[in-house]
Amino acid sequence: MKKQNFLNLNRIFFTIIIFSLIVGCHRKSEYSAILTRELEKKNEFNDLIFDMKIGQSRQDYFDICYQLNKQKKIISGARSLNPELILKSKNGSTKGSNIKMSFNGIFNEKKTMRGFEMRFYFTGWSNWNKDLSSENLLAQLKDTLKRWFPGNDFFKVNFENNLSAEVKIDGNRRILAYKVNSKDVAVRIEDMSGKYD
């Protein structure tokens, strides 16, 4: 009797594992299928923020940042002196709900921009204030990113390195948005065509 119960538990456990693997592979294959489909369209989406573009030189990036700083639209921030700015939150009634954004270009060996990194957090974040957590921030940022970068919707992907991210792919441009910790949300925008590798 005990052996039969043990075998039944093993079957149930085995079935759950197989089901989890199938679901996980399906999401990953959905990501691969969407990436392939978008790259096959040969549409280029190189626009970033502040008239920056994938494919610009590193010097162009610094010149734009210099002008933005001169116009007092950005400041040199605390995170490795990356440019920073404050965004108004949709939930402006909550104290501390403005969002601090820092950003930096990703460059190849030829000093050509191949991507863009951004970090966000609520200015009033504290560990005990769940309203200003990265979970809530990520949901809000998805809407903002869709406005900044119109096109396809976000979908969730669990990558092999235990990274769970919201992904948006439009042509050659992939946007990953994910929680770094309870405070920060990271956004990484990259050219997936390999043109700037």
Question: Positions of the model-derived regions?
Answer:
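Sec-dependent bacterial lipoprotein signal peptides
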Residues: 1-23
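Bacterial signal peptide processing site
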Residues: 25-28
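N-terminal low-complexity, Pro/Thr/Ser-rich intrinsically disordered segments
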Residues: 30-50
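Post-signal-peptide N-terminal segment of Sec-exported extracytoplasmic proteins
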Residues: 43-81
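Extracytoplasmic beta-rich ectodomain segments of secreted or membrane-anchored proteins
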Residues: 72, 83-104
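Long, charged/polar, surface-exposed segments that mediate recognition or autoinhibition
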Residues: 94-161
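An acidic-aromatic pocket/loop used at catalytic or ligand-binding sites
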Residues: 99, 118-123, 169-197
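Beta-rich nucleic-acid/ligand-interaction surfaces
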Residues: 162-167
